[in-house]
């Protein structure tokens, strides 16, 4: 069974966690058979390690790490792969793979246009 770990940056503003929870509720509605957890890189106790542990406790055999980031910055180039490797060592029976950041995507451009036109 595949699990999904969505990782966001995190913020001192705690409402950002609620925003991601709302987005993940929308995702879960579209992928009802998926096992999804989220984690934050900073300013939260919802760490990558805790997210992987939660998925492992639910019996997943694979985890796809999906970054909720726009750009390929230092967290995506170094920090998240390092954390994923540490988690993989702790859970050797679980295959962990990395997804891509949101990046340059036509759908994001559409959202931006909607916001501009308001």
Q: Predicted segments — roles?
A:
Residues 1-118:
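Active-site-proximal alpha-helix that buttresses catalytic centers in soluble enzyme cores
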């Amino acid at each position: 069974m595949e699990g999904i770990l969505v990782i966001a940056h995190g913020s001192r503003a705690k409402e950002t966690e609620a925003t991601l929870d709302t987005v993940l509720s929308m995702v879960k509605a579209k992928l009802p058979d998926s096992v999804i957890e989220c984690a934050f890189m900073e300013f939260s106790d919802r760490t990558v390690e805790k997210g992987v542990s939660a998925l492992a406790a639910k019996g997943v055999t694979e985890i796809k790490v999906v970054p909720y980031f726009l750009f390929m910055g230092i967290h995506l180039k170094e920090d998240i792969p390092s954390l994923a490797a540490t988690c993989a060592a702790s859970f050797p029976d679980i295959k962990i793979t990395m997804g891509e950041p949101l990046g340059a995507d036509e759908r994001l451009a559409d959202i931006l246009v909607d916001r501009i036109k308001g």
